[in-house]
Amino acid sequence: MVHLTGEEKAAVTGLWSKVNVDEVGGEALGRLLVVYPWTQRFFDSFGDLSTPDAVMNNPKVKAHGKKVLNSFSEGLKNLDNLKGTFAKLSELHCDKLHVDPENFKLLGNVLVCVLAHHFGKEFTPQVQAAYQKVVAGVANALAHKYH
């Protein structure tokens, strides 16, 4: 569960309504793979990830980034039940994919950077603080099934 004030919730949902999930999702996942290259090992089937340009223009990275942000959107609709919302994804990433749960935190922080880049002055420190709460809550929910 993420505890947001009414003002924080309005800031998060208001900004999110303007997010282009296709664009931001691909950019966020791409940046994760470039900035933290060890995360690429989970994406062997994505083809060429050999350079930053290859990563950022990879159609599979873009498609998966969109999928990730669509899941994040579901989380925003269920802030009071993030663990339930992400239970199956947590199980998948833990039991089948063996993703280090620290990567969820990294992706959340990269997403915040991408949002700041896209929204500039509209992404105020108050909006950032609210988003940091949300991405921390989502990362925690995704790590829930880990032993």
From Swiss-Prot:
Red blood cells. It comes from the Eukaryota. GO terms for molecular function: haptoglobin binding; heme binding; hemoglobin alpha binding; metal ion binding; organic acid binding; oxygen binding; oxygen carrier activity; peroxidase activity. This is Hemoglobin subunit beta. CDD domains: Hb-beta-like (cd08925). The modification N6-acetyllysine is found at K60, K83, K145. Gene3D superfamilies: Globins. The modification Phosphoserine is found at S45. Disulfide bonds: none annotated.
